[in-house]
Amino acid sequence: MTRTGLSDTIAAIATAPGSAGVGIVRISGPDALGIADGAFRGRRRPSATRGGRFLFGQLVAGDGEVLDEGLCLVFRGPHSYTGEDVAELQTHGSPAVLARVLSRVLELGARPARPGEFTLRAYLAGRLDLAQAEAVLELVNAGTETARRQAALGLSGALGERVERIAAHVTRTLAALQAMLDYPEEGVPDEDRTVPLAAAEAELHALVGTARAGQVATRGARLALIGRPNAGKSSLLNALLGYERSIVTPIPGTTRDYLEAQLSLAGVPVTLVDTAGLRETGDEVEAAGVRQAVRLAESADLVLVLEDGSQPRDHLPAELPRETRMLRVRTKADLPAAWTDPGALDVSAVTGQGLSALRDAIHTALIGDAAQGEAWLTTERQADAARRALTHIQAARSLPDDLAGYELEEALRALADLTGRDVQDDVVDAVFRNFCVGK
């Protein structure tokens, strides 16, 4: 995103496309309230109104035509979202009305906002750190309760506060280390260096451990169902969904291509992938489906390996990579058992036996033990910065005091990258590139 024109007054429609009860045209910048004067007619001019107030009146075109009745909300910088003067013109959510109101605002001197420019200005004004800015986009896109909760925590500054606590431990250690090197006669106690650094490492290790959960909560997870033909993959998919999405027959090889379906499992957005049954076959079409099933399993966040518990156990003909996350499921638990395995979950798609336990196991496998009330790392950018900080702290703990200082300084730089207090422009641009225009 270009940084030119940041002193311009900008405007955009801030509500989603399509018809709605209410629509908003947002204006921000030094001339925002003066421009609102020209587009809004009420008992008082927006420019003569104190911040935090709203006015009722009419939205008007340049020739005086009344476009709609609505509200003008007035915010004065720095006490606004962007830190600048802001006017929000609220109308009925007709696309035609909003287009005319925006056109009038642009006629009066505003320029169209670029994607994410309102939030970029909030970041540059110090109203948000970079992690909070990312949380704005995550909150807009949140499709489940877990995603919403994490985005709200991020927007509240909870992640930044967590990072600042870690940085305070590192800073305290660095200060004690510097004092010991500069004034050895003062006898700085060892615990002044070791205790806070150990605390920083423990807290940062826990934070890094939330990265998988955070990214799964925000972008969702792909869950592949694999097994031999007639292992019950399609039946289990239908049972988890609560409706018939996949065709189920007693004929082996019914599923030859993969099939996807979306659902929310305990607040986590999940894409279920029903795959072809794994077996040696001379049918080229079915063989292609088998190869595809293995590829889908290798790229999935979690694999459910299904085995028919009512038939003699026959392990899969294909090997999955060692790092593949998987849960073993013994299907058809309503039928007499031909074998048992304490490491497998017993499930019946017919009676529903074990489905609740399976859902819980899937949630645990995807989210782990990340504390629900804590802020998580929700982007790869955040996770990378946290891992770098942890690496430098671990290096510092293994080095002599006269060499550890450099590693601690690098750890602080990585933590500053995480919150955006010290980050390069191209990284900031990459964050805001995915925003919609009205944000």
UniProtKB/Swiss-Prot annotation:
Gene Ontology CC, one term: cytosol
The keyword Repressor is annotated on this UniProt entry: no
Cellular localisation: Cytoplasm
Chief place where the protein resides: cytoplasm
Coiled coil stretches, renumbered: none
Record key words, sorted: Cytoplasm, GTP-binding, Hydrolase, Magnesium, Metal-binding, Nucleotide-binding, Potassium, tRNA processing
Cofactor binding note of this UniProt entry: Binds 1 potassium ion per subunit.
Enzyme Commission code(s) on record: 3.6.-.-
MF-aspect GO terms: GTP binding; GTPase activity; metal ion binding
Top enzyme class: hydrolase
List of residues binding K(+): N230, T249, I251, T254
Binding site for (6S)-5-formyl-5,6,7,8-tetrahydrofolate: R26, E88, R127, K439
Quaternary structure and partners: Homodimer. Heterotetramer of two MnmE and two MnmG subunits.
Binding, Mg(2+): S234, T255
Span of domain TrmE-type G: 220-367
Entries under InterPro entries matching the protein: G_TrmE (IPR031168), GTP-bd (IPR006073), GTP-bd_TrmE_N (IPR018948), GTPase_MnmE (IPR004520), MnmE_dom2 (IPR027368), MnmE_helical (IPR025867), P-loop_NTPase (IPR027417), Small_GTP-bd (IPR005225)
The name this protein goes by in its record: tRNA modification GTPase MnmE
Superkingdom per UniProt: Bacteria
Annotated transmembrane regions: none
Similarity comment: family membership: Belongs to the TRAFAC class TrmE-Era-EngA-EngB-Septin-like GTPase superfamily. TrmE GTPase family.
Biological process terms in GO annotation: tRNA methylation; tRNA wobble uridine modification
CDD domains the UniProt entry points to: trmE, TrmE_N
Function: Exhibits a very high intrinsic GTPase hydrolysis rate. Involved in the addition of a carboxymethylaminomethyl (cmnm) group at the wobble position (U34) of certain tRNAs, forming tRNA-cmnm(5)s(2)U34.
Keyword Nucleotide-binding: yes
Needed co-factor(s): K(+)
Residues reported in the UniProt entry to bind GTP: 230-235, 249-255, 274-277
